Structures are given as structure tokens and as C-alpha cells.
Amino acid sequence: MSKLFWAMLSFITRLPVPRRWSQGLDFEHYSRGIITFPLIGLLLGAISGLVFMVLQAWCGVPLAALFSVLVLALMTGGFHLDGLADTCDGVFSARSRDRMLEIMRDSRLGTHGGLALIFVVLAKILVLSELALRGEPILASLAAACAVSRGTAALLMYRHRYAREEGLGNVFIGKIDGRQTCVTLGLAAIFAAVLLPGMHGVAAMVVTMVAIFILGQLLKRTLGGQTGDTLGAAIELGELVFLLALL
């Protein structure tokens, strides 16, 4: 299990992981690593939250929120934000399904993708600032948001088909079973409940689950399935929805 965790950490983040820690693990077995997603999210959110706490006393709430969001993006290499931008460029192009998928593979940033990035990043900064001004625990909120968003991404993998012939998302989409999905969601719920007691965290997770489930169904209808880009979009939007639900 530890080897699987390190493999997933190096796969979905840019955090330095010695290769020997995940050596010998077959790429086709990576789908089993879905259960580690909430734990990886917990780690990323905790680091981002620590950045906020350290900087808040020095430069104030808005700048602390800005840098915490920046650090979170850097730790993932902008991987999920790129998926969000590509998904919006494709889906909002109002073209045929095949053309949408082609647009999503285009490395160039379009208008819809750019607007989505601006909206999501700015919204995260504003919501974090508002939560801090209301006295909410930012470290716990960010850790829970990142854990839940990665956990609920399993809803776009279970019983969904991959919309392309090949790609990184094919490792997970349609490859995880009901037990893995339940374990992943269960771990995310435990983290949310422990970090944000009083049902606050669990309630926010329920809202996030509903939002991501609806997103998955809409993308399935539009694209005929899911891709790695739509998983990234779900994670980014999941973080934002969870934080909004805490207000």
C-alpha cells in the first residue's frame, strides 16, 4: 500500500518522490491507487493551509489566500487547472462531440478556458478570504476541501467510460469498482468529519458529491464519457464547491 501511495503522489502531483519508493509497481495497477486520493489531497491542502497561516500575520488575509492558492497549483503542476481549461474550451465550443475532444487536446488556451481559470482561481481566493474573516479554520478547511475534491472525483470514474482511444485518464475511468469507490468516498468523509466537526464538513461533502455527480452526468451526455481533463476539472470545481459550502 505504501508503494501505491508514493506512486500516486508522484503521478498526480509535482512533489519530489524518490523513484525507488514506487519502483516495481505496474502502471496497469494504478487504478487501485484511487483510495489514496483523499490522503494525497489532505497532504496538499495541509501544506497550502500552512502557507496561509504563516503569511497571514505578515501580509494579511487576501495575499495569504493568493499565495496559498498559488502553492496548491504549483504542487500539482497546474495539472488540474489545465484540465479545467481544456474541458471548458471543448464543452463550450458548441461543436460536435469529436471536435470537442479535439479542442480539448489542443495545447493552446482558448477564451472559455481562460475565463474558467480566472473565475476559479479568483473565486478560491475570495472564498478563502471570506472564510478567514469569519474565523473559520483555514488549514482544516483547505485540507478537507482537497481531500474531498479528490475523493469525489471517483464519481467520474465509477461506471463511466473513457471518451478517447487512449490517454492518462484511461488508467482510472471505468477501471474502479463499487468497493473502491465507497472506500474512497468513506475516507474523504472521515477526513471532512474529523477536520471540521459538528457535521459542517460532512454537509459540505454532501453538497460537493451532488455537484460532482451532476457534473459527471452532464459531461457524459456532452462528451460521451470522461477524460483526464474532465477529472482535473472535477477536482478544481470540487475544491471550490466544498469551500463555498462552508460559508
UniProtKB/Swiss-Prot annotation:
Its cofactor is Mg(2+). It is an enzyme of class 2 (transferase). InterPro entries: CobS. Its EC number is 2.7.8.26. One of its GO terms (cellular component) is plasma membrane. It catalyses: alpha-ribazole + adenosylcob(III)inamide-GDP = adenosylcob(III)alamin + GMP + H(+); alpha-ribazole 5'-phosphate + adenosylcob(III)inamide-GDP = adenosylcob(III)alamin 5'-phosphate + GMP + H(+). Keywords: Cell inner membrane, Cell membrane, Cobalamin biosynthesis, Magnesium, Membrane, Transferase, Transmembrane, Transmembrane helix. GO terms for molecular function: adenosylcobinamide-GDP ribazoletransferase activity; cobalamin 5'-phosphate synthase activity. It is a multi-pass membrane protein. Signal peptide: none annotated. Belongs to the CobS family. Joins adenosylcobinamide-GDP and alpha-ribazole to generate adenosylcobalamin (Ado-cobalamin). Also synthesizes adenosylcobalamin 5'-phosphate from adenosylcobinamide-GDP and alpha-ribazole 5'-phosphate. This is Adenosylcobinamide-GDP ribazoletransferase. The lineage of its organism: Bacteria, Pseudomonadati, Pseudomonadota, Gammaproteobacteria, Enterobacterales.
